[in-house]
Amino acid sequence: MFAPTMRRLFLFAALLAGLAALPLLAAAPAASSGMRLGIKGYDPVAYFTLQRATPGQPQFEYSWDEHVWRFASAEHRALFKSDPVRYAPQFANFCAVALARGEVREANPEYWLISDGKLYLFGKPYGPDLFRKELGKNVERARHNRELLKDQEPGR
């Protein structure tokens, strides 16, 4: 009676280990496609609908503009598919403040601002306030510098 119980326990443990590995397998499409994760895997639609930075899930991915985008739900993925330009951050994975200064720095998805229906990401917590102070000038500078620095996307 002891041996069958141990065997069942072992099989149960093996099953649990296999289930625990499923999220790692689900994450494979972004890595195996050779494309970068857009905004480190955060859901771009959630900034607009939930008003917060929300990690996306590997089962809700969509490839667009040389990035793999992740979403918190199938509904968010469908919204993005219908109008990706509306939901994608203005400067991909760039920090908007750094870009306005002519620098290349990766954005942190936790620091963000929506202004005039556009999503901007920043590298530091004070980024949104700093960018907002001279919004028009900063957007113009960042757009100009984005074209000059587009081949230097952070993390490439």
Segments predicted by a language model, with ranges:
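Charged, low-complexity intrinsically disordered segments
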Residues: 24-156
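Residue-level detector of intrinsically disordered terminal segments
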Residues: 5, 23-24
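Bacterial N-terminal signal peptides that target proteins for export
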Residues: 2-13
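Bacterial N-terminal signal peptides
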Residues: 12-23
